[in-house]
Structures are given as structure tokens and as C-alpha cells.
Amino acid sequence: MTKAALYTLTIATAIGTGLTPVPCCAYALDAQLDCKSNAHAFIAPLLTDQYIDPKPMRVEANSVNAFRPAQGSNLTAFGFRVYAVLGYEHGDKMFKQGSGQPITDSAYGAVVAGSAEDVEARVREAGSDAVVRQVIPLLLTAIFCNRQ
């Protein structure tokens, strides 16, 4: 191998290593998705620590607010990358009201990249009783805690 080729390979490896996500720096939401909390307690620390954008990217008619993970936040849930963080708590100024009837007094969760079957298996393995629903087949799945 020539000196130039070796140098190019070394630089490419160094750059690639620097751009690869580091699993040790990911912030896992597993413990909070045990469904023993409320939306305010779930969302507030994520906003304070700037893991999610403060303005919801979407507010559903049932008042569920979808927050986008902040750039570089590396949020995970049960080992899956988080696409969106969900939440709504009645009477809490942190959440915007939708146009329809609110889903419940307090609900929270996450949308992750993974199939519903794989996500459900990991959620149950962790002992959570969260509701797991397919959003986009084989791509996105919602993990949802709904307190009545």
C-alpha cells in the first residue's frame, strides 16, 4: 500500500469514527417509560436539559404534543433511537391544547425507530406495561403511557 493510500485510509477512518454515534453518550428513556409517572415529570427534565426542542413539532387533535429530539441529543428508548417524544398533561402550560377532546389527564411516551414486534419484546422484557403501537410498519413504533 502506498504512503498516500495509507494516509487517506487513516484520515477516512478518523473522520468516520468521529461521526459515528457513541452509544455510551445516549440518554435512555427506559426508566421513565415504566408508566408510573406523569407527562410533566417525563417532559420537564428533557426540556430543562435541552434533550428536546421546546416547541412541539405537532399537536394532535387529542392534545398529544410531539417534541423533536434536539440536535445531537441521542435519545433512546429500550435500545431504539427516539424519533419523537410525546406528552400531554391537562392544565399544564408546558403543553399546547389540541382542537378536540384531550386523550386523558396525563399521557406520555416516545416514537422510536423499530418494528412494533421488536419494540414490544424489549418493552415487556423491561417490565413496562406501556402501550406499543405501530406508526409506520417496520419503521416507527409508539411507546405510550396513559394515566387515567
Positions of PLM-derived features:
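Bacterial N-terminal signal peptides
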Residues: 8-18
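Sec/Tat signal peptide C-region and signal peptidase I cleavage site
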Residues: 19-26
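N-terminal secretory signal peptides
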Residues: 26-85
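Short, ordered beta-strand-loop transition motifs
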Residues: 57-63, 71-72, 99-105, 131-140
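Long, charged/polar, surface-exposed segments that mediate recognition or autoinhibition
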Residues: 69-126
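C-terminal partner/receptor-binding element of secreted or periplasmic proteins
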Residues: 123-148
